[in-house]
């Protein structure tokens, strides 16, 4: 009997071991599937799960009762394209549908689905234009100096424009989540944001000691690593926004798309892209840019170098959507036009077809001072003599002649 019991136990152990192996293999496959998912989609699923768990709490007698009929869907009900508020004494408001997709037919995906994901990015990654109120010891000029320095670092290490704009987004969103940051920490936060962005975007990012070197001893490698973890926790690991330059790349690509509809490789003139990107490089130094979504900023910059019709075609925006941003961007566009378009820079080791994507640095702070001076002059002129609300048209020629005869 002991031998039979031992053999039985041994067989049970084998069965349990086999089940463990199958469970482990399934876990490995599940981990691979999770790894291949979009990080934003995974975070959204986690948030949805947490909300569902909160909704499944025990019944609370003190909670307000809700009409159960509101949870019963009406069968065979046609959905309206525009949702309307219930009619009241006030004028009913309508929710505007999302702007139409300007993307061409894609051979690698559904253009409507791609456009929907792009629009959801703007809703997910929000910024706070008043984040400096959380930091009484900081000024808007300090942010401009830091971003100008990050542009210079990007040019030295031949980093892409997308890398810089990712770092700018990480910095602004991190500062909006903190309080009472002192001036001496700004450089550490900025270089840590660029360190994170370079690992996400660059194929061969600079080493950690290279980022510490450009700070001239102000930040050590260990401090950058510590700040990196603090920033990612504060950002809740949301590290894949659609930046300003990403929107610009889409708009210009759609504007110059060929008959084949191929959009995987750039089809636009590099000089055109660089000229508009220089305007955005200047605008992003002003903290006022945080008032507008990234897509609106890119569309407004494109408008200043093209036309209203082209902007509407490639972005889906209407004039009312970008009017405020276009007017805000006027002094910056005036400075860029006075400076003239800079020549396309070529970098050693960078292919010619990718040279326009490398972040460049100019005397951005001087240009920012000129733009802010023009902004003050324009605001003063508008205060003294505000522009007419309607377009004035001359009278017909027949009335002109009759009025002239009467005066004689």
Curated annotation (Swiss-Prot):
Residues 1-17 have a biased composition (Basic and acidic residues). CDD domains: CYCLIN_CCNE1_rpt2. The modification Phosphoserine is found at residues 101, 385, 397. SUPFAM superfamilies: Cyclin-like. The keyword Cell inner membrane does not apply. Found in adult spleen, and to a lesser extent in adult testis and brain. Its main location: nucleus. Residues 1-27, 379-408 are annotated as: Disordered. Phosphorylation of both Thr-393 by GSK3 and Ser-397 by CDK2 creates a high affinity degron recognized by FBXW7, and accelerates degradation via the ubiquitin proteasome pathway. Phosphorylation at Thr-74 creates a low affinity degron also recognized by FBXW7. Keywords: Cell cycle, Cell division, Cyclin, Nucleus, Phosphoprotein, Ubl conjugation. Pfam families: Cyclin_C (PF02984), Cyclin_N (PF00134). Interacts with CDK2 protein kinase to form a serine/threonine kinase holoenzyme complex. The cyclin subunit imparts substrate specificity to the complex. Part of a complex consisting of UHRF2, CDK2 and CCNE1. Interacts directly with UHRF2; the interaction ubiquitinates CCNE1 and appears to occur independently of CCNE1 phosphorylation. Found in a complex with CDK2, CABLES1 and CCNA1. Interacts with INCA1. This is G1/S-specific cyclin-E1. The gene is Ccne1.
